[in-house]
Structures are given as structure tokens and as C-alpha cells.
Amino acid sequence: VTSQPERTVREDLLAAALALLDEHGPEALQTRKIAAAAGTSTMAVYTHFGGMPQLIAAITDEGLRQFDEALTLPATDDPVADLLATGIVYRRFARDRPHLYRLMFGSTSAHGINAPAHNMLAFGTAEIDAAVPSFAHLVRGVHRSIQAGRLRVAPNESAEQTDAAVVAAAAQFWTVMHGFMMLELAGYFGEADDEVYAATQILSPMTVSLLVVLGDTPERAAQSLAAALHQA
């Protein structure tokens, strides 16, 4: 009998772990359950990952890859609408896969093991794609919006300071999204099946306000939001 290639066994284990996480939460991430779901032995988990900390890191990496894939949207001629559409898809991913979302960003752990974190502000715009691909979507959106004259970030600073300001502005959008999502997933904004009210009363006004603070007009920001809702 020909044994399975090592890559396939590893992928099977990772897919099984993600499925268990999505369905049952981080408590289900146990070597026995993962191995059984993948149709292999518990030893395979250690053979292919080294241990649970490495497996949790691999789950996080794969989750972020899938998150990055979900956030990859076609560009339009309205960069602010594209930035907001990214936020809409961001929220959809987090609502659809709350256990993975919490694990990816360190708000929950699996048996006391947390996913590794990255300092987003340590990277410039040229490094973001390789370092943190999912965050890069926000950085590109902010950068395109600045180039289009919709946003203004450190206009009189040096190129290096402006580069850092672009990343920081993207982090402001991420902070709005992540803070909202954590409260929404915890149930503070109503029932899980009511996704409209909290978005229209809380998330949309916060996002438009941030756009205006960064230089956009309320009217253009509202128009871009309407376009983003149609686009995403």
C-alpha cells in the first residue's frame, strides 16, 4: 500500500482542525479529535506539526490565508468604496467563522495556547503584502484613497513619515472593524441574525466619521458607502 504524501496528511490534519474549530470552538482542538477527523493517528499531529503550539500557529496561518483570499476584491474607480467593501467582507467573514476569527486575532486561546501576534506598525507599505497580507488590503485601500485625493494623511511630512502614517491610518480602520466585531460577536449589539441594525446605527456612522476626520467629505463618504454596500 502506497503511503500518502506528507503534504497531503498535513493538509488533511489542518483541514480537520479548521472544521472542528468552526463547528465546536477551540475546545475541540485536541490531538485525538483532530487525528480521528483526518483519519490518521495522533502521532501524525506531532510528526507533521511538532506539537499543539505549532498546530495552533498553522491553523492561524491558514485562517489568515483564507481571510486574505476573502478580502481580495476587484478594484473599482472609487477607492473609498473599495476600502469600505473590504470592511463589509471583513465583517461577513468574522460573523460566518467567529471561532476562527477570535483565534486568529488572539481574543481566545486553544487550551491556553494563543496564536502569535504581529506588530503591524513595524512594517512599511512596501513590506505589508509579504508580512501581513490580510492587513495589506486596508493599507492599499487607504493609499489608493490618498492618491485619489479623498484622504489626507501627513501631507507635509517626509516620505518615510507619510508611509508610516498610511499604515497607521489603515490600523485606525482595522481598530474600528475589530472593536465592533468583538462586541457584536459577544452579543452586545443584538441577536446574531440581525446584521442590519448594528451596521447602520453603529459601524457605518463610525466609519464615515473616520473618513471625514481623514479628509473626506460627509457627502462623498456616504456615496462611497452606498456603492460599497452594492459592491460587496
Where are these regions (language model features)?
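Generic hydrophobic, amphipathic alpha-helix propensity
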Residues: V9-A17, I34, I59-F67, L71, ...
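Amphipathic alpha-helical linker/stalk segments
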Residues: G63-A85, G112-I128, V153
